[in-house]
């Protein structure tokens, strides 16, 4: 899912190409799962003729500041992306719409043409993004509930160490908590923990002063570098775990050291056991539960399925009310089943396959049944190889 660097790259592209220009044409998709709380026609009327003054971001959220409110706000979800026609903008790899596709893309949820002819589109292939029209985006959820932005509002080393000392949860889920620090997602959390040589399941309050300092430094350096290159992963340093974290178990190495995969905070997590070791009570606890974990580990998805949807929902303003939304919860289970059958394919093709399951709402039953049978067959056929992960 797009994280702080990808959203910041989109913000900068808008700032460089769209400021001071008037919106002369608007097309809003008729998709009430993505377009939140307003009809397409009302959305269009509200921003037509307005001038874009600035593009702002907090965490993984972006909004356009116009010459008068309300303002369009974008929560990128699993696969949201900003496109500006004729302008190169870095996108999360599973967000990318092919250049050969129609313009605006069939996945476009928000499209505007500016008075100089420039065209901007927000697309979402997976339909887990949220596009809102808000009078003051920072005063309402999800932005009002976010913690300090990891790039713009970093804690000092002392503040960071003091806050970690009060947290009795494991460090990886804490870093993913957008209410604690906003902008860090799964790949950044894995990267900064690897750089700081901290095990993802180490309890935050048990970290030494030196570890807190190392983690503070790695967060700063990883995010600043990713932003510096506009989130272009081909320019990330070769020693980053990022380049190998999606390879198959047993084939993933960084600097000659084996990468292993566990689940931390419900997320598939890449780490290097040789360098990131548990210690103290966490090590004792892990030794007791490790056999059980190994038994369920192959069932985890590849890090881009249901768990990303759950992270998006946690950031959503309806986090409390969603407990009663049974249809949405039901849809969340189907992509998870599908992902299990395709967990060995990590090249991004799973995005389009999942998209076919989500999109045709009226045809969900038969494909789901078919995928469950395929999952069972795949699971039975692959038990022994997966058992060798450890």
Curated annotation (Swiss-Prot):
Q: What is its EC number?
A: 3.2.2.23, 4.2.99.18
Instruction: Provide the active-site residues from the annotation.
Output: 2-3, 60
Compartments, as annotated in UniProt: Nucleus
Organs and tissues of expression: Expressed in leaves (at protein levels).
In this chain, DNA is annotated as bound at 107, 126, 167, 186
After gene disruption, what is the outcome? No visible phenotype under normal growth conditions or UV-A irradiation stress.
Main localization (coarse): nucleus
Per its UniProt entry, which superkingdom is the organism in? Eukaryota
Question: Do you know which SUPFAM superfamilies this protein is assigned to?
Answer: N-terminal domain of MutM-like DNA repair proteins, S13-like H2TH domain
Recorded catalytic reaction(s): these are: Hydrolysis of DNA containing ring-opened 7-methylguanine residues, releasing 2,6-diamino-4-hydroxy-5-(N-methyl)formamidopyrimidine; 2'-deoxyribonucleotide-(2'-deoxyribose 5'-phosphate)-2'-deoxyribonucleotide-DNA = a 3'-end 2'-deoxyribonucleotide-(2,3-dehydro-2,3-deoxyribose 5'-phosphate)-DNA + a 5'-end 5'-phospho-2'-deoxyribonucleoside-DNA + H(+)
Per the UniProt entry, what are the Gene Ontology biological process annotations, in alphabetical order?
Answer: base-excision repair; DNA repair; response to oxidative stress
Which segments show compositional bias classed as Acidic residues? 301-316, 343-355
Q: Which GO terms describe its cellular component?
A: nucleus
Q: Where is the composition biased (Basic residues)?
A: 321-337, 360-370
Keywords in alphabetical order, please: DNA damage, DNA repair, DNA-binding, Glycosidase, Hydrolase, Lyase, Multifunctional enzyme, Nucleus
Q: Where is this region: Disordered?
A: 283-390
What Pfam families does this protein's entry cite?
Fapy_DNA_glyco (PF01149), Fpg-like_C (PF21218), H2TH (PF06831)
Any idea which GO molecular function terms this record carries? class I DNA-(apurinic or apyrimidinic site) endonuclease activity; damaged DNA binding; DNA N-glycosylase activity; oxidized purine nucleobase lesion DNA N-glycosylase activity; zinc ion binding
InterPro entries linked to this entry: DNA_glyclase/AP_lyase_DNA-bd, Formamido-pyr_DNA_Glyclase, Fpg-like_C, FPG_cat, MutM-like_N-ter, Ribosomal_uS13-like_H2TH
Q: Which PANTHER family match?
A: FORMAMIDOPYRIMIDINE-DNA GLYCOSYLASE
Say what the protein does: Involved in base excision repair of DNA damaged by oxidation or by mutagenic agents. Acts as a DNA glycosylase that recognizes and removes damaged bases. Can process efficiently 4,6-diamino-5-formamidopyrimidine (FapyA), 2,6-diamino-4- hydroxy-5-formamidopyrimidine (FapyG) and the further oxidation products of 8-oxoguanine (8-oxoG), such as guanidinohydantoin and spiroiminodihydantoin. Has marginal activity towards 8-oxoG. Has AP (apurinic/apyrimidinic) lyase activity.
Q: Which family does it belong to?
A: Belongs to the FPG family.
Q: How does it assemble?
A: Monomer.
Q: Which NCBIfam families match?
A: fpg (TIGR00577)
In Swiss-Prot or TrEMBL terms, this protein is called: Formamidopyrimidine-DNA glycosylase
Native source organism of the sequence: Arabidopsis thaliana (Mouse-ear cress)
């Amino acid at each position: 899912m797009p994280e702080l660097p990808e959203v910041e790259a989109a913000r900068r592209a808008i700032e460089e190409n769209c400021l001071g220009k008037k919106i002369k044409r608007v097309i809003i998709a008729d998709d009430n799962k993505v377009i939140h709380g307003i009809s397409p026609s009302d959305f269009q009327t509200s921003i037509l003729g307005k001038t874009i003054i600035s593009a702002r971001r907090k965490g993984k959220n972006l909004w356009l500041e116009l010459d008068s409110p309300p303002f369009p706000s974008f929560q990128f979800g699993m696969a949201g992306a900003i496109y500006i026609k004729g302008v190169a903008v870095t996108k999360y790899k599973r967000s990318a719409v092919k250049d050969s596709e129609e313009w605006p893309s069939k996945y476009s949820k928000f499209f505007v043409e500016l008075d100089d002819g420039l065209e901007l589109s927000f697309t979402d292939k997976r339909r887990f993004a949220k596009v809102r029209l808000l009078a003051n985006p920072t005063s309402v959820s999800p932005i009002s509930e976010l913690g300090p932005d990891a790039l713009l509002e970093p804690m000092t080393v002392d503040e960071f160490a003091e806050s970690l000392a009060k947290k009795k949860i494991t460090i990886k889920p804490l870093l993913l908590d957008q209410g604690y620090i906003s902008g860090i997602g799964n790949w950044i959390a894995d990267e900064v923990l690897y750089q700081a040589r901290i095990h993802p399941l180490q309890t935050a309050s048990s970290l030494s002063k030196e570890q807190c300092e190392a983690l503070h430094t790695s967060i700063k350096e990883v995010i600043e570098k990713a932003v510096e290159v506009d989130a272009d992963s081909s320019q990330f340093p070769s020693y980053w775990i990022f380049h190998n974290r999606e390879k198959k178990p047993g084939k993933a190495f960084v600097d000659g050291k084996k990468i292993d995969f566990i689940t931390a905070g419900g997320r598939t997590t890449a780490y290097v056991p040789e360098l990131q070791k548990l210690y103290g009570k966490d090590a004792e606890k892990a030794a007791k539960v490790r056999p059980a974990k190994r038994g369920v580990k192959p069932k985890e998805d590849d890090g881009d399925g249901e768990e990303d949807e759950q992270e998006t929902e946690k950031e959503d303003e309806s986090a409390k009310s969603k407990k009663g939304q049974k249809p949405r919860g039901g849809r969340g289970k189907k992509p998870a089943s599908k992902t299990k059958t395709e967990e060995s394919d990590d090249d991004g093709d799973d995005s389009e396959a999942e998209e076919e399951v989500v999109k045709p709402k009226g045809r969900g039953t038969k494909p789901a049944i078919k995928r469950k049978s395929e999952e069972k067959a795949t699971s039975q056929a692959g038990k022994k190889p997966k058992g060798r992960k450890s």
